[in-house]
């Protein structure tokens, strides 16, 4: 199944990312929880790339070039923190791509068949992209396999 409107759709990858997970069991009822997390990022002038949230978990990515030790230590005062280095973000980009049936399902099925674990998913309401995080050493394989599925007759 090719993505509709081939000329307006793309696959991108960005390497040298760090991914972090924040766990706080009472986050869903804690007023200002997200504010406190982003306040620390703001203090360190560290931009956040992708974000995914649930009631007790916040996952996000940022560039590896930033020194994260002090940042992570401050964030540990707010929540339990896990940091993962050597990550890449992959994005399927196109007009209303997240409205096209089975795009995400097909992408994740193909990646699963190749043994690629998707660690985080982020899709905004803009309908322009679906992004996800994988281990950096799998990023090139990920892009090749997605290209076969969506842009070739694979």
Question: Which residue stretches match the model-derived regions?
Answer:
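A conserved regulatory-domain signal marking ACT and ACT-like small-molecule sensing domains
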Residues: 1-154
């Amino acid at each position: 199944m090719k993505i509709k409107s081939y000329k307006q759709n793309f696959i991108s990858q960005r390497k040298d990312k760090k991914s972090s997970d924040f766990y706080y069991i009472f986050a869903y009822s804690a007023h200002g929880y997200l504010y406190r997390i982003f306040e620390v990022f703001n203090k360190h002038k560290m931009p956040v790339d992708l974000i995914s949230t649930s009631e007790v978990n916040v996952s996000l990515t940022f560039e590896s070039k930033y020194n994260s030790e002090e940042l992570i230590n401050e964030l540990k005062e707010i929540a339990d923190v896990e940091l993962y280095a050597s990550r890449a973000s992959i994005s399927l980009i196109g007009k209303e791509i997240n409205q096209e049936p089975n795009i995400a399902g097909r992408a994740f099925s193909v990646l699963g068949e190749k043994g690629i674990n998707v660690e985080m998913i982020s899709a905004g309401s803009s309908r322009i992209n679906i992004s996800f995080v994988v281990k950096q050493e799998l990023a090139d394989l990920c892009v090749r396999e997605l290209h076969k599925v969506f842009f070739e007759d694979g």
